[in-house]
From Swiss-Prot:
Single GO cellular component term: small ribosomal subunit
Organism, as annotated: Opitutus terrae (strain DSM 11246 / JCM 15787 / PB90-1)
Function according to Swiss-Prot or TrEMBL: Binds directly to 16S ribosomal RNA.
PANTHER family per the UniProt record, alphabetical: 30S RIBOSOMAL PROTEIN S20, SMALL RIBOSOMAL SUBUNIT PROTEIN BS20C
Protein name, UniProt field: Small ribosomal subunit protein bS20
Length: 86
């Protein structure tokens, strides 16, 4: 349990940020799954649209500090590799 007023506020902020971060990460996982299914279906248009949505979400996650920029670069590289390989 936090002892000082500032520690109580920091704990409250930590919980709030944790919830936000989990939401963003869950959205990224969902978009990645949609991308994988679009690629497996073989439809180029839906694959490209899913790739754009996923990369946009990854960039927004980097901007808000949820994901490190190197992790995002690796994820976007992976997307380009699987979408544009065909």
């Amino acid at each position: 349990m936090a002892n000082t007023k500032s520690a109580i506020k920091a704990a409250r902020k930590s919980l709030r940020l944790h919830d936000r971060n989990q939401g963003v990460k869950t959205r990224l996982k969902t978009l990645h799954k949609k991308l994988e299914t679009a690629v497996k279906s073989g439809d180029a248009a839906s694959s490209k649209a899913a790739a754009v949505a996923y990369t946009s979400a990854v960039d927004k996650a980097v901007k808000s500090g949820v994901v490190h920029r190197n992790v995002a670069a690796r994820a976007k590289s992976h997307v380009a590799k699987i979408v544009f390989a065909k």
